[in-house]
Amino acid sequence: MRYVRLCVISLLATLPLVVYAGPQPLEQIKQSESQLSGRVGMVEMDLANGRTLAAWRADERFPMVSTFKVLLCGAVLARVDAGLEQLDRRIHYRQQDLVDYSPVSEKHLVDGMTIGELCAAAITLSDNSAGNLLLATVGGPAGLTAFLRQIGDNVTRLDRWETALNEALPGDARDTTTPASMAATLRKLLTAQHLSARSQQQLLQWMVDDRVAGPLIRAVLPPGWFIADKTGAGERGARGIVALLGPDGKPERIVVIYLRDTPASMAERNQHIAGIGQR
């Protein structure tokens, strides 16, 4: 697919650096920031070559909220590829291991869940207890952060477990990423040698099967477009989505959008993310 030549715009020091393919994405984001009374971060990246197609506040920190679960399952799959884990290994847990919003894991206190089932629950339904159970297998938040450093992400960090990681305090670097780092790391997981082809396809399929992202970019995509995504939401207006998109049913680009520090309702945040992500 042909893309217009990228433009690099130097703004005043008080404004974020913007790289963009045309005026529409920038104008939509500026309008959203004004209406939300908060901050928006966005990166659109070519999946094949890693070129940045559009960006706004690309290097500013935003709470990952539940978008971290894609990275977590990437770390789990890396352990599977290394022979250190098996997707069919069953984990048993107790009532006291459950945290708020565990729609799948709360139903399996008797029989437990496999690693693969936990990843599916964590990504497709954002099950928080599934996320914590998986975090324990990779060494907790510090273990996931170490994995990210190993694959070249020196920015993204996870410091806490669900649900404390959704606190999203202003100025707090804990449990944050930047849009640029998240996009680059997701691309590494899906295209580089950090995961086997089989694991890459599995991670992508879990994102394709996402069942809680309907009101966001999925709501505004043209017919026939591919989408695989993972959303997140937290306190103080935190909201986010990481997605792969493309026409003709093929993933061609990565889109990362984060919001923070806004008093807007969930419905309003969803609407703005959909508007920014609209093709």
From Swiss-Prot:
Entry EC number(s): 3.5.2.6
* Domain of life of the native organism: Bacteria
Q: Is the GTP-binding keyword given for this protein?
A: no
Record keyword Iron present: no
Q: Which Pfam families match?
A: Beta-lactamase2
Provenance organism: Klebsiella pneumoniae
Source species taxonomy: Bacteria, Pseudomonadati, Pseudomonadota, Gammaproteobacteria, Enterobacterales
Q: Example GO biological process term?
A: response to antibiotic
- What name has this protein been given in UniProt? Beta-lactamase
Q: Which UniProt keywords apply?
A: Antibiotic resistance, Disulfide bond, Hydrolase, Signal
> Which region is the signal sequence?
1-21
Q: What are the protein's GO molecular function terms?
A: beta-lactamase activity
**Active site located where?**
66
What's this protein's family per the entry? Belongs to the class-A beta-lactamase family.
Alphabetical list of InterPro entries matching this protein:
Beta-lactam/transpept-like, Beta-lactam_cat, Beta-lactam_class-A, Beta-lactam_class-A_AS
The miscellaneous remark of the record is:
The class A beta-lactamase family has a specific amino-acid numbering system, sometimes called Ambler or ABL numbering and often misspelt as Amber. A multiple sequence alignment was used to derive a consensus sequence and then the consensus was numbered taking into account insertions and deletions. This allows use of identical numbers, e.g. for active site residues, despite differences in protein length. UniProt always uses natural numbering of residues, hence there appear to be differences in numbering between this entry and some papers.
